[in-house]
Swiss-Prot record:
Co-factor: note: Binds 2 manganese ions per subunit.
Name the record gives this protein: Probable cytosol aminopeptidase
Amino acids binding Mn(2+) 1: 268, 345, 347
Lineage: Bacteria, Pseudomonadati, Pseudomonadota, Alphaproteobacteria, Hyphomicrobiales
A Pfam family reported for this protein in Swiss-Prot or TrEMBL: Peptidase_M17
Organism: Methylorubrum extorquens (strain CM4 / NCIMB 13688) (Methylobacterium extorquens)
Principal place of residence: cytoplasm
Record field: catalytic activity: Release of an N-terminal amino acid, Xaa-|-Yaa-, in which Xaa is preferably Leu, but may be other amino acids including Pro although not Arg or Lys, and Yaa may be Pro. Amino acid amides and methyl esters are also readily hydrolyzed, but rates on arylamides are exceedingly low; Release of an N-terminal amino acid, preferentially leucine, but not glutamic or aspartic acids
Length: 497
């Protein structure tokens, strides 16, 4: 596995030899002063001639790659288009960093972060480094034969107006990148490696960053009454775990925390209601919500966020055997509410129900957000580029939506109306675990809502974005690590003091 790229900073006036030289232009193909100086007359003239012959127009996210001419201290010239003046006024620096890293590949490059019509702040440069790091990620540790380019590590030297300021700002971006990479690694791991006990052990390594970690084993879960989660786990040879992570970064240690809760089904066969064979291999990623929570706690602790945040994940494997729970079983959750099992493949909500209730009752959080690859229905509704948001609180919903927009992890709020709640009423128990064919994402959210009292709460259904998502300029990984950037932005803007 890798996020293999080395990034350093130097002044715009620096000079160097070898590798790629990257400059930016708008749709008028004008070069900045720093870019012109770096290219020199031979490079400037070559770019102009090549642009005309190649019909390169400098459109946003376009590139022209040329062998460097004599007199230019580089192996290749990479000219990246930024588009019109309007485009340059709203550059997504994270995407630009990923696009640039993609064009450079496993090579060394000097990137002149200066161009016509824009001035890059230290924050912009930090976002650029975040995108470059995320684009360079690979998960290849199980490949015994690798291509030469897979073995090489890229190195970017960013020429900027304020190297020290950019480097300081980049430390925070580096923390976020590490959190996303951790989440991707967890999602990409095979389930024979990342079983519940091993997952819990890996999470316990967060203590090295100052995170307090508590692991609940089966005996403890039975003692407190986590009957819903334990029912899901009883068909597996692997015992479940609940892991609680506490980051106390606020000046006031007694300030109520924000709680982040993740579904951690490390493999979901469907249980007795077994899934079809096609695509079942993807069900190692049914713990993407928990990975986002772990990655976020890693990011917050790494950058010493001034906030109190609790992360909690329920880690189980949903398997069929003679001890597995069955359709028509009735289980008692930690809240005391009873659940009729209609479909054992609707297991994630049972896991979340007990964890939500435990965190709410024990830690009295100011808000709770759960993340789960919960339903195929949300993929039908929203596709694989946007997550579904359900919430009982307009203010929290608005904050999450804005944070997702700013971070590049978009959400769309979905309705929670009484009809969805009524759909999960049961003849034999307090509720059933599915609400029928229609509105599956909404009835799943309505189920979770029954385990939330008066606390502001949001549910993010990330089934479409958490795994096998659409490739982008900052992600070529099967496991996207989706949610870490959104949650980090949310904490930064609304919970840090």
């Amino acid at each position: 596995m890798a996020g293999g790229i080395e990034i350093t900073f130097e002044p715009l006036s620096s000079r160097g030899t070898g590798g790629d030289l990257v400059v930016f232009v708008g749709d008028d193909l004008a070069l900045s002063g720093a870019a012109s100086e770096a290219l020199g007359q031979p490079g400037t003239e070559l770019v102009a001639r090549a642009a005309a012959s190649e019909r390169f127009k400098g459109k946003a996210q376009s590139a022209l790659v040329l062998p460097a001419p004599a007199g230019v201290e580089a192996d290749r010239l990479v000219v990246i288009g930024l588009g019109s003046e309007k485009d340059r006024a709203k550059i997504d620096w994270t995407v630009l960093g990923g696009f640039t890293a993609g064009k450079v590949g496993a090579r060394s490059a000097r990137v002149v972060i200066d161009g016509p019509g824009f001035a890059a702040s230290a924050r912009d440069v930090a976002d650029f480094t975040l995108g470059a790091r995320l684009r360079s990620y690979r998960f290849d540790q199980y490949k015994t034969k690798k291509k030469d380019e897979d073995e090489a590590g890229a190195a970017l030297t960013l020429r900027v107006a304020d190297p020290s300021g950019a480097q300081a700002a980049a430390r925070s971006a580096e923390a976020v990148a590490e959190g996303v990479i951790l989440a991707r690694n967890l999602v990409n791991e095979p389930p024979n490696v990342l079983y519940p006990e091993e997952y819990a052990r890996r999470v316990s390594e967060l203590t090295q960053l100052g995170v307090e970690v508590e692991i609940l084993d089966v005996a403890r879960m039975k003692e407190i009454g986590m009957g819903a989660l334990l029912a899901v786990a009883q068909g597996s040879a692997r015992e479940p775990r609940v892991v609680i992570m506490r980051w106390n970064g606020a000046d006031d240690a007694a300030e109520p925390p924000l709680a982040l809760i993740g579904k951690g089904v490390v493999f979901d066969s469907g249980g007795v209601s077994i899934k079809s064979a096609g695509g079942m291999e993807d069900m190692k990623g049914d713990m993407g919500g928990s990975a986002a929570v772990v990655g976020t706690l890693h990011a917050l602790a790494s950058r010493k966020a001034k906030a109190n945040v609790i992360g909690a994940i329920g880690i189980v494997e949903n398997m069929p055997d003679g001890a597995a729970y069955r359709p028509s079983d009735i289980v008692t959750s930690l809240s005391g509410q009873t659940i009729e099992v209609i479909n054992t493949d609707a297991e994630g909500r049972l896991v979340l129900a007990d964890v939500l209730w435990h965190i709410q009752a024990t830690y009295k959080p100011k808000a709770m957000i759960d993340l789960a690859t919960l339903t195929g229905a949300i993929i039908v509704a929203l596709g694989q580029d946007i997550a579904g948001l359900f919430s009982n609180d307009d203010a929290l919903s608005g904050q999450i939506t804005a944070a997702g927009e700013a971070a590049g992890e978009k959400v769309w709020r979905m309705p929670l109306i009484p009809a969805f709640d009524k759909a999960i009423d049961s003849k034999f128990a307090d509720m059933k675990n599915t609400g029928g064919r229609h509105g599956g994402a909404a009835t799943a959210a309505a189920f979770l809502k029954r385990y939330v009292n008066d606390v502001p709460w949001a549910h993010l259904d990330i089934a479409g974005v958490g795994m096998s998502s659409t490739p982008s300029e900052i992600n070529r990984s099967w496991g996207a690590g989706w949610g870490v950037r959104l949650l980090d932005r949310l904490v930064r803007e609304h919970y840090e003091r």
